[in-house]
Curated annotation (Swiss-Prot):
<dbReference type="InterPro" id="IPR030963">
    <property type="entry name" value="DHQ_synth_fam"/>
</dbReference>
<comment type="similarity">
    <text>Belongs to the sugar phosphate cyclases superfamily. Dehydroquinate synthase family.</text>
</comment>
<feature type="binding site">
    <location>
        <begin position="168"/>
        <end position="171"/>
    </location>
    <ligand>
        <name>NAD(+)</name>
    </ligand>
</feature>
<keyword id="KW-0547">Nucleotide-binding</keyword>
<protein>
    <recommendedName>
        <fullName>3-dehydroquinate synthase</fullName>
        <ecNumber>4.2.3.4</ecNumber>
    </recommendedName>
</protein>
<feature type="binding site">
    <location>
        <begin position="128"/>
        <end position="129"/>
    </location>
    <ligand>
        <name>NAD(+)</name>
    </ligand>
</feature>
<feature type="binding site">
    <location>
        <position position="183"/>
    </location>
    <ligand>
        <name>Zn(2+)</name>
    </ligand>
</feature>
<comment type="function">
    <text>Catalyzes the conversion of 3-deoxy-D-arabino-heptulosonate 7-phosphate (DAHP) to dehydroquinate (DHQ).</text>
</comment>
<keyword id="KW-0170">Cobalt</keyword>
<keyword id="KW-0456">Lyase</keyword>
<dbReference type="GO" id="GO:0008652">
    <property type="term" value="P:amino acid biosynthetic process"/>
</dbReference>
<dbReference type="InterPro" id="IPR050071">
    <property type="entry name" value="Dehydroquinate_synthase"/>
</dbReference>
<feature type="binding site">
    <location>
        <position position="150"/>
    </location>
    <ligand>
        <name>NAD(+)</name>
    </ligand>
</feature>
<dbReference type="GO" id="GO:0046872">
    <property type="term" value="F:metal ion binding"/>
</dbReference>
<keyword id="KW-0028">Amino-acid biosynthesis</keyword>
<keyword id="KW-0479">Metal-binding</keyword>
<feature type="binding site">
    <location>
        <position position="263"/>
    </location>
    <ligand>
        <name>Zn(2+)</name>
    </ligand>
</feature>
Length: 362
């Protein structure tokens, strides 16, 4: 088992990474008599809910659970209300613990509930997808979507612990594994050139879920994110760099309807658009743009815009992005592989040109 610590100004919390952690009662920082509400979905529940309940009950906990429908389109205010109702009906107090057992949607929704139920209760993240293990479970971002924009209603709320059981990836559909690799590649592209080179050498092993490669990959991603969050917990500075490709990607998700493209798929195409725009601005080289494109393709990820979207469809969605300040578009771009920056007030004509260069052609 590996442990990565997230060091915040006022406290710290551990990220445990290993095989078989969900069934090991020693993984859980919960004492006899504690009350727990597990938030999950039917897809995850069929594999892991009984395992987690059994481990918690061995520790003497009182365990309830609530099932949300599966999918990004259920990352809504209505799902929040389902969990609030379950907590209230079962008389959970301020001393309860919420466990988010699932992927990014479950983590975001359960996290927002933990932030707001009785003004805040303890949260444990148990991510079961690669994307949530390397990204969304770490750092305290919680949110639900609005029909006009992704992640527009939320809060920063740190978990007390993240428990990453790499065995859960064995039941993950290949498409979901590939989507998670988009966020993995992002870390190398923005902050760690050596890790990007490692990915070029080992991406096939990650696609095939080789245990040693996976454990190294997940721990490195968590360490990179932990370091960024320690410097900038609420995204006032460096943390914005973690959004490479996300402004373009969120536009794709919102325009197509949540869930039609997976988040990682949209981010993959968004990273290509950001890289092409960076090259147009004279930053990253054509050769490095090609390296990024080839690595994404080897991870079976899209690198061109959906054929149902026109370049002009992007900007209205992008102008609702949370990084927009005073009506000016701000984008995360690349100086080089391993070095990102935030560009302020990027010329819309150049943005559209970059999108056109990433548009599907027959």
């Amino acid at each position: 088992m590996l442990c990565v610590n997230v060091e915040l100004q006022e406290r710290r919390y551990p990220i445990l990474i290993g095989s078989g952690l969900l069934q090991d009662e020693r993984s859980y920082p919960i004492k006899r008599g504690d009350r727990v509400m597990i938030v999950t979905n039917p897809t995850v529940a069929q594999f892991y809910l009984d395992t987690v309940i059994y481990a918690l009950e061995k520790r003497g906990c009182v365990v309830d659970h609530v099932l949300l429908p599966d999918g990004e389109k259920y990352k809504t205010l209505e799902s929040l209300n389902l969990i609030f109702t379950a907590l209230l009906q079962d008389n959970h107090g301020r001393d309860t613990t919420i466990i988010a057992l699932g992927g990014g949607v479950i983590g975001d929704v359960a996290g927002f509930v933990a932030a707001s139920y009785q003004r805040g209760v303890r949260l444990i993240q148990m991510p079961t997808t690669l994307l949530s293990q390397v990204d969304s479970s770490v750092g305290g971002k919680t949110a639900v979507n609005h029909e006009l924009g992704k992640n527009m209603i939320g809060a920063f709320y740190q978990p007390s612990m993240v428990i990453i059981d790499t065995l859960t990836l064995n039941t993950l559909p290949k498409r979901e594994v590939n989507a998670g690799l988009a966020e993995v590649i992002k870390y190398g592209a923005i902050l760690d050139y050596e890790f990007f080179e490692w990915l070029e050498q080992h991406i096939d092993e990650l696609v095939a879920l080789h245990p040693e490669a996976l454990q190294h990959c997940i721990s490195r991603c968590c360490q990179i994110k932990a370091d960024v969050v320690a410097r900038d917990e609420t995204e006032k500075g460096d943390r914005a760099l973690l959004n490479l490709g996300h402004t373009f990607g969120h536009a794709i998700e919102t325009h197509l309807g949540y869930g039609n493209w997976l988040h990682g798929e949209a981010v993959s195409t968004g990273m290509m658009m950001a890289a092409v725009l960076s090259e147009e601005l004279g930053d990253i080289s054509i050769a490095d743009v090609s390296r990024l494109e080839k690595l994404l393709a080897r991870a079976n990820l899209p690198t061109v815009s959906p054929d149902t979207m026109q370049p002009e469809d992007y900007l209205p969605h992008m102008m609702r992005d949370k990084k927009v300040l005073s009506g000016k578009l701000r984008l995360v771009l690349l100086k080089s592989l391993g070095q990102a920056y935030v560009a302020n007030d990027t010329d819309h004509t150049l943005v559209l040109n970059a999108i056109r260069r990433c548009t599907q052609t027959d």
